[in-house]
Each structure stands twice: as structure tokens, then as C-alpha cells.
Amino acid sequence: MLTGDNEKGNAIVSEAEKYLAVPYVWGGTTPNGFDCSGLVQYVCNSLGINVNRVAEDQFKNGTAVNKDELQPGDLVFFEQNGYIHHVGIYAGDGMMIHAPRTGDVVKYQSMETDYYRSQYAGARRVY
């Protein structure tokens, strides 16, 4: 799934791939179970990149990236009613790795669905 020549960003995606199929757990921050921001924080911390714990605060980390300039490893954020409620790790080709919701698992997901397109808030580069 990796695209581009972006060593640090690709390392973030490769690290996140280790946790595919881990169950979603509200408030989860370990490989026993992750919520969306717990996955992002765990992956980044394991690579020596410090990010905040919750998605709304993670949206303040790093530098802003335009959607048409996304690179693998960028953090992508989604909002509803002005509130950042979800974060994923951009994996390239319009896909992200994320922990979506209770009853689901860490997985690849297209960002091009109506749901994610309509709630896209922006992206941050933390590496």
C-alpha cells in the first residue's frame, strides 16, 4: 500500500500495519485494543514521535498538510459539528489505517467514501 519515497512516513505506516485486526476498544492504548487516537499515539511513540493522546489534541501536533499533498504517515482527521472526532494514518492511494468503532478492528479504509469525504477536517505531518 505504501507509495512515494518517504522513509519516515512509510515507517509509520509499516508500524501501524503490525496492528491490523487488533480490536477496537474505547480508550484503548495498547495492542490488546486501540481506539483511533490510541492507535496513532502508540504507533508514533514506538517510533520516537510524541503526539497527544486524543484526536482533538493530536490535530494540534505537527504541521498542517493540504489534502492534495498527503504522504504516507500523515495523520488524517475527521470532524462533525466542528469537533474532531476521529483520526487515522494515511497509507497512500486514498487509504488510511484506523481503529473505526466498537465491534470493529484496526483496518485499511478508503477515505473516499461519502462519510469520510464529508467529515474530512485536515491532516498533520508529525515526522
What do these predicted regions represent?
Residues 2, 17-72:
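Catalytic cysteine-centered active-site loop
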Residues 2-7, 14-15, 49, 91-127:
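Aromatic- and glycine-rich peptidoglycan recognition patches
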Residues 10-16, 60, 87:
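Short, flexible segments with low predicted structural confidence
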Residues 39, 88, 123:
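Short hydrophobic/aromatic patches on the structural cores and recognition surfaces of FHA
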Residues 49-108:
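...with weaker cross-activation on analogous glycine-rich loops/strands in unrelated enzymes
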